[in-house]
Amino acid sequence: MRGSFFSRLPPQLSLLLLLLLLLSWRRVWTQEHIGTDPSKSPVAPVCPEACSCSPGGKANCSALALPAVPAGLSWQVRSLLLDRNRVSTLPPGAFADAGALLYLVLRENRLRSVHARAFWGLGVLQRLDLSSNQLETLSPGTFTPLRALSFLSLAGNRLALLEPSILGPLPLLRVLSLQDNSLSALEAGLLNSLPALDVLRLHGNPWACSCALRPLCTWLRKHPRPTSETETLLCVSPKLQTLNLLTDFPDNAFKQCTQSLAARDLAVVYALGPASFLASLAICLALGSVLTACGARRRRRRTTVRHLIRRQPDPEGPASLEDVGSPTTTAIQA
């Protein structure tokens, strides 16, 4: 019966029906061996102990008083919530087992130390929240592996210095939150390494009205902000003890500031410095040798002249042989 039915159909349609039958049999076999438990479903991620996971790759580990990043993370995890815990340190490769993470929240922990290789392996991470922690410093290259990052929050920490090498080139970063830290200025190359940056949150920092603010003021003029935000961006003048709006400084206000050397210029200085020192030392040694030789030559001339003067006879002649004390006198006396 089945053979007669398939024989009446076109060959293409017969192959399509056979393919559908094979797919249906595979689905029945999967349900029999795996079951309907969502924890065993390939859609649900492998869940760390004490955390709750849901289909779609979300792992919720919030407010569990965890002292460290939980073990048991997998590549199925797309979103990891670790906020409101007691994680104080991020070691190297802390999230290496969750390389498919897109969203990572570490807000309101007790973070004081983040290793420079803590985020290695998170090349597709898009959002990272490190706000409301106790970070005072960050190592160079900490965020360099996060090439796909578009949102980064460092708000509510104790950062006093943020060098360009810490962030590294983040070509897709659009939002950077730095509010409520201890920043007084931003390094010149920091904003240049973030070409896609559109939102920069800065309020709540003790900005100092100095030449170091020139890169930041230039960026703010090129990226107008809402009035409510710009009104809170104030800097303190150390000499006058007054508050000024960051947006009130035109570019000519920094004309008295000396332009700092670029990295390329510094490299040239560092390269030529030892060479120029060695060249100066060689010149000094050469001049010293020449002067020493000239002095020795003058001394030899003076010595020769003195010997010649002593050997010349007296033009008046000796008064007697006794005065001269010649060998002849000595022989006669003998």
Swiss-Prot record:
Entries under SMART domains matching the protein: LRR_TYP, LRRCT
Annotated TM spans: 266-286
Entry-linked PROSITE patterns: LRR
Extracellular side: 31-265
The LRRNT domain, residue ranges: 38-75
Domain LRRCT span(s) in chain numbering: 205-259
Main location group: membrane
Cytoplasmic compartment spans: 287-334
Residues making up the signal peptide according to the UniProt record: 1-30
GO cellular component: cytoplasm; cytoskeleton; plasma membrane; voltage-gated potassium channel complex
Cystine pairs: 47-53, 51-61, 209-235, 211-257
Region (Disordered): 312-334
Subunit record text: Interacts with KCNMA1.
Domains as described in the record: The transmembrane domain is necessary for interaction with KCNMA1.
The name this protein goes by in its record: Leucine-rich repeat-containing protein 26
Organism: Rattus norvegicus (Rat)
Lineage per the UniProt record: Eukaryota, Metazoa, Chordata, Craniata, Vertebrata
Gene: Lrrc26
